[in-house]
């Protein structure tokens, strides 16, 4: 089986998830390809992987990003990059296309999803945030907004990534995404948590099956141990709350941890 995964990055959390899935798929005898946006850190890493390809150029990404910031017409850029990606898809002829994060100013979702509709092969889409069913936001819980259920508009997070400098076209973007994303017949959504699944089930994507597959953990590295710091912590005879984040913010509960 041939599988192609597409993600915003080949690094960090979602990038590593994509690459680890590809690695496991190859170990089981499948042809696993990956594609991602080429970032500055990707260039420094200089990945030499015959199964990986980069989408677009740094110049295209920059133009796309500034166009989005100035107009709030998200994901209308990267036309050439998206057609080049489609050419690669046709060349690989994958049996399954697995999407991850497609926000990030590197693909034109209109061109991509119109192609996926015609290509008519199974599409998996792993949600790593809420962007797919909103008009802009990747998260909305910190501002307690539920406009994503009815069509967005009057966005309270216009300055939050992916931001807009001047306009609020979140209602237009919401309608456009609904039309594009619900046009795919054979689509299965994957959520890493029950919480995100429940949100997806309340959105315009509720007609699609959403399966919870938790992010994997390397049990060789993360496992119960005795001795060392365990013994020191046990001596304290206190309840310990552990939280981990790549970068802490109010939305990720930093203030709650401080209160605890």
Describe each region flagged by the PLM.
Residues 1-47, 92, 118-122, 185, ...:
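N-terminal subdomain of nucleotide-sugar transferases
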Residues 12, 219, 248-253:
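A short, basic/aromatic alpha-helical/loop segment that forms part
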Residues 87-107, 121-128:
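Short N-terminal targeting/anchoring amphipathic segment
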Residues 190, 232-252, 258:
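Conserved donor-binding/catalytic core segment of Leloir-type glycosyltransferases
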Residues 195, 216:
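Carbohydrate-associated surface elements
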């Amino acid at each position: 089986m041939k599988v192609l995964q597409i993600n915003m990055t080949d690094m960090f959390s979602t990038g590593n998830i994509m690459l680890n899935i590809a690695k496991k798929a190859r170990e089981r005898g499948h042809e696993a390809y990956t594609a991602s946006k080429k970032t500055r850190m990707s260039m420094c890493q200089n990945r030499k992987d015959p199964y990986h390809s980069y989408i677009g150029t740094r110049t295209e990404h920059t133009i796309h990003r500034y166009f989005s910031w100035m107009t709030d017409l998200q994901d209308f850029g990267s036309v050439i990059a998206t057609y080049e990606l489609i050419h690669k898809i046709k060349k690989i002829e994958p049996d399954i296309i697995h999407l991850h994060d497609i926000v990030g100013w590197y693909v034109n979702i209109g061109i991509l999803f119109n192609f996926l509709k015609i290509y008519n092969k199974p599409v998996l889409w792993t949600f790593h945030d809420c962007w797919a069913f909103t008009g802009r936001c990747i998260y909305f819980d910190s501002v307690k907004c539920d406009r994503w259920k009815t069509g967005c508009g009057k966005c309270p997070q216009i300055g939050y990534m992916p931001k807009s400098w001047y306009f609020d076209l979140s209602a237009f973007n919401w309608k456009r995404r609904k039309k594009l994303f619900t046009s795919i017949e054979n689509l299965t959504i994957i959520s890493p948590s029950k919480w995100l699944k429940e949100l997806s089930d309340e959105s315009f994507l509720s007609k699609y099956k959403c399966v919870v597959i938790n992010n994997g953990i390397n049990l060789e590295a993360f496992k119960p141990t005795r001795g060392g710091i365990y013994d020191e912590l046990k001596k304290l005879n206190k309840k310990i709350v552990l939280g981990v984040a790549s970068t802490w913010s109010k939305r990720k509960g930093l203030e709650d941890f401080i209160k605890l």
